């Protein structure tokens, strides 16, 4: 996936595309009203997920029905680590260091997420980065048709990878079951 993303974004960089600042294509929202109040999380995945932008991603689940982000697609961006995740389901967050990013009219959020992922943003300083650095960055944006093409293509690959990963896990389980019954 990274190789394909790299190739597609490299193509966009060499083409004559509009140079825009991040602040002109993304809006951000502070997560204050979506913060979880309980720190005891459930493992019941039928509840509301509590998210973080880092590797843990889903910290657990909560039964809190208030303050749930349910406005549709967004990117959660950790202001300290610059980790980010593309989200398309209702959630709550644990940390006030998260920025909730949404695309402005005429821009494809999934495309922007893939572009920012391509850039490999990372932090060595423990400070807030979004307003002071990320919003000021300039990136090359193709027209909305091309944005949608790239976003849809990468999304279809992600779906295929997810399906194949699930099949792989099922095959491993089947193998373990067969091996356990082989020597009975």
For the regions a protein language model found, what residue spans apply to each?
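Short, solvent-exposed loop/turn elements at domain surfaces
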Residues: 59-61
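Conserved helix-loop functional segments at active or binding sites
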Residues: 31, 121-122, 156, 184
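Basic, amphipathic alpha-helical recognition segments used for DNA target recognition
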Residues: 82-144
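Amphipathic alpha-helical coiled-coil/heptad-repeat segments
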Residues: 1-19, 140-184
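Non-catalytic DNA-recognition/assembly elements of restriction-modification systems
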Residues: 2-3, 7-35, 41-55
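Short, surface-exposed loop/turn microsegments at beta-strand edges and helix-strand junctions
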Residues: 39-50, 63-95, 116, 128-132
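Pocket-edge structural micro-motifs
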Residues: 52-55, 77-79, 102-103
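Hydrophobic aliphatic residues
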Residues: 26-29, 116, 182
């Amino acid at each position: 996936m990274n190789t394909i993303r790299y190739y597609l974004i490299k193509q966009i960089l060499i083409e004559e595309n509009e140079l825009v600042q991040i602040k002109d294509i993304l809006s951000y929202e502070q997560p204050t009203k979506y913060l979880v109040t309980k720190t005891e999380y459930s493992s019941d995945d039928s509840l509301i997920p509590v998210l973080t932008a880092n590797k843990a991603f889903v910290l657990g689940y909560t039964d809190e029905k208030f303050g749930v982000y349910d406005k549709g697609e967004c990117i959660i961006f950790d202001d300290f680590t610059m980790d980010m995740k593309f989200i398309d389901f209702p959630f709550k967050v644990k940390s006030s260091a998260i920025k909730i990013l949404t695309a402005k009219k005429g821009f494809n959020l999934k495309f922007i997420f893939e572009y920012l992922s391509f850039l490999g943003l990372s932090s060595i300083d423990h400070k807030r980065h979004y307003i002071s650095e990320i919003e000021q960055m300039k990136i090359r944006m193709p027209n909305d048709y091309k944005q949608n093409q790239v976003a849809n293509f990468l999304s279809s690959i992600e779906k295929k990878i997810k399906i194949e990963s699930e099949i792989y896990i099922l095959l491993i389980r089947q193998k373990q079951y067969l091996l356990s019954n082989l020597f009975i």
